[in-house]
A protein has these predicted regions:
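Iron-sulfur-associated redox domains of electron-transfer enzymes in respiratory
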Residues: 1-144
Length: 144
């Protein structure tokens, strides 16, 4: 049976789409506090913990220094998810920066929902410098 090239392309399209879905790797951006979370990321790397490779870490001096515009721009530029990682409450190098970050993230989640984006694509987590395993699990769980 002979098929035209158009028919062959039409039949191959669903297979290609299915293959693309199976190999989808979300692009994740992680803003890490310099004093805790970034050191936790470093510990995870030095400990050779297995982590996905489809995330990018950006160091920020404090989780409160992550401007909402940075998050919105990340989504506009194609990020599938954004993590903001900071010091545990009461352990912030800048006293209350993590509390400020928590308020900002709550407002940003409402804004994302207003724009029709899933607010779960943005998360705030606390990771200390000694929590390399927690950094690994946070990244892995967020990507899954």
């Amino acid at each position: 049976m002979n098929m035209s090239s158009t028919q062959q392309e039409h039949q191959a399209a669903p297979a290609a789409a299915k293959s693309a879905e199976e190999t989808f790797e979300p692009k994740i951006l992680a803003f890490c506090c310099n004093w805790c979370s970034y050191a936790g990321a470093d510990l995870a790397g030095v400990s050779r913990l297995q982590m996905p490779t489809n995330f990018l870490v950006l160091r920020s001096m404090c989780s409160a220094r992550v401007d909402p515009e940075f998050v919105l721009r990340a989504f506009a530029k194609g990020a599938d998810g954004v993590l903001v990682l900071g010091c545990h409450p009461a352990d912030c190098h800048y006293i209350g920066g993590n509390y400020r970050a928590r308020r900002r993230i709550a407002l940003l989640k409402m804004l994302l929902e207003h724009y029709g984006l899933d607010p779960d694509r943005l998360q705030l987590e606390w990771v200390s410098a000694s929590e390399g395993v927690k950094f690994q699990s946070t990244i892995t769980d967020f990507i899954e």
